[in-house]
Amino acid sequence: MKLAANLIVFAAVLLLVAAALLYTQQRRMIFPAPADYPAAPPPGFRIVHTQTSDGLRLAAFYRPADEGKKTILFFHGNGDNLSGALQAVRGPAAAGHGLMLVEYRGYGDNPGSPSEKGLYRDGAAAMRWLTDAGVAPQQVVVAGNSIGSGPATEIALRNDVAALVLVSGLSSLPDVVAEAMPVVPRALVRDRFDNAAKLARVRAPVFLMHGDADTLVTPANLERLRAARPDATVALVAGAGHELAYTAAAQAILVGWINGSLAARP
């Protein structure tokens, strides 16, 4: 009896230690900030710097739009950086759209540590920079890939933008964690990125694109986002996984939607 009681106590202590480690260390897993970083922007882009509300000076890549084209404010995934972001916007760049590629705090040479609130501040700083540069919010398409769907949704909620585009978007981070690790209590997930709860309040048109073979952010996330925003345009791409944003096919779909659905919007 005493042995059983001791085993229960030991198991409880192990669970508490594991929970404490998960709670304190999870941002290292959620925001890995890869080391391969572009030394300089490619032709057509230049480095610009934004100023966040909590005092951080962050680098970003920017290229102006051709006449009559939209500017895409782009938020990359958590395991990516500006190198990957450049690969994800080759199609829009070739089509003449302007691009503001946000780099997060703690990524590359940027100061700070990433978090949900931090990424929202980084996005707000990029939006302010565009406005100060003469790009009206109504000319901005806010786009987010994977976890970048979080700051993209938040910025579209706060601003009167042209459109919101979510590629491989999360319905929420606890939803993704629950599917991957059902034993982890939702309450332990510190950063929420609750996009589904916000979509109905976004005034701009919404475009949702997802791969039907995505095993990281599963299509169940798309269904929850679609349920939250029934009037959204939806593209479910057959055979595509979580690398959807980097494919030429996905970028062609995105450019076609922007050039078609948004062409008549002032």
Which residues make up each language-model segment?
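Acidic catalytic loop of the alpha/beta-hydrolase fold
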Residues: 212-217, 242-244
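Primarily recognizes the serine-hydrolase "nucleophile elbow" in alpha/beta-hydrolase
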Residues: 129-133, 137-183, 198
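Short alpha-helix in the alpha/beta-hydrolase fold that links the catalytic acid
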Residues: 88, 195, 204, 218-227, ...
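Short beta-strand/loop motif that positions the catalytic acidic residue
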Residues: 201-203, 208-210, 214
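An N-terminal hydrophobic leader/cap segment in hydrolases
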Residues: 7-51, 266
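Catalytic active-site module of serine/aspartate enzymes centered on a nucleophile-bearing elbow/loop
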Residues: 248-266
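Catalytic histidine-centered segment of alpha/beta-hydrolase-like enzymes
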Residues: 240-250
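Membrane-embedded segments
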Residues: 53-132, 150, 156
